[in-house]
Amino acid sequence: MDFANNPVIKKQIFFDEEGKAKIERSLCTDCLSCTKVCPAMAMKQQGKPMEISEIIDHVLRQELFYHHGEGGLTVSGGEPLSHGDWLIRLLKEAKKHRLHTAIETCGYASYEVLKEAINYLDVIFFDIKSMNDEKHKHYTGKSNQIILDNFKQLVQDAKTTKITARTPVIPGF
């Protein structure tokens, strides 16, 4: 395969001065084409696309394992809030079946999505990597302001949803 002239690689993947492959994530459309042309085969699609009804059916078949506890449906990432419309549809369907619902989020999303999701969530695991904006920018490339603003608003708005704030403990971070 001619990787140098492959349109996916030319658009999304490039090599820096040191010869390291870099991905231009802002151009990513989640088409997964890069997984088909990765010369080192380091990029792979994990999981499989599923319809909401398939996900709910799968979770319901596992009910024996979580019936007496708080098991159910937990949506994690990437970032579930970045797929707002789909997430809301999934959570609504889960609630129709009286499933316990949770998400794991870093909170870097539009608050409007989070505000609507609250109505269908029992638990939110909210990851705050750093309270310090400079450290957060240094290690993630993004300000933490949206995250902290969303968390503050969430605490005010989520009357019946359990919120667990999590912070990773990483030496030197």
Model-based region annotation:
Residues 2, 32, 84, 88:
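Conserved active-site region of classical short-chain dehydrogenase/reductase
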Residues 2-22, 33-48:
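Iron-sulfur cluster-binding cysteine motifs and their immediate structural context
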Residues 28:
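Short Cys/His-rich zinc-binding micro-motifs
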Residues 31-34, 106:
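Generic recognition of cysteine residues
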Residues 15, 23, 136, 140:
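Short clusters of hydrophobic/aromatic residues that line enzyme substrate/ligand-binding pockets
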Residues 53-173:
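Conserved AdoMet/S-adenosylmethionine-binding subsite of the radical SAM
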